[in-house]
Amino acid sequence: PSVSYTQLMGTRPYTFEYSTHAKILKDTSWIAEPNWIHIYYPYFDANVQLTYKPINSDSSVQDYLNDSFRLTGKHQVKATAIDEKILFLKNGNVASVSELSGEVPSPFQFHITDSITHFLRGALYFNMSTKNDSLAPAIAFIKSDLVHLLNTLEWNE
């Protein structure tokens, strides 16, 4: 598909540009918290789960970072490799991204924080069996969209 983006609208504590091939859906799971959303790609039947956490006196950014690495680490059983990178983004933010190889449920994950107020984690899932070799073109397309999301992310105060 061609590449074009639109601005996330609403009153969330974050905003970014996302693919016009995707739909924003509210997270309706029983554990969902305010400002958790899904970026759903109907063409690929893929979903990016975004979980937002405010950093406040009751929590710490270190707890959220540990949770993020722990959740990524759960895939080690099926992963043939986990490639972690730090991205220094055009908007001045810094993000950590993990690319997982093998028959893993989530081949791409990330987190980004300002270390003071905001923490956002994302994980890509496909609503089908994990045949990531055949999904490689879709994974690459969505990964590119997610890097664009990270480059355009702004925190709302």
Model-predicted regions and their roles:
Residues 15, 62-72, 143, 147-150:
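Generic detector of well-ordered alpha-helical segments enriched in charged/polar residues
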Residues 18, 46, 149:
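Residues that flank catalytic or metal-binding motifs in active/ligand-binding sites
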Residues 6, 10, 14, 114, ...:
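Extracytoplasmic/periplasmic, Sec-exported soluble proteins
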Residues 22, 123-157:
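Surface-exposed amphipathic alpha-helical segments
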Residues 22-23, 77-82, 153:
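Short glycine-aromatic motifs
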Residues 1-32:
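N-terminal "mature-domain start" segment
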Residues 28-121, 128-132:
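Conserved polar/disulfide-associated segments of primarily extracytoplasmic proteins
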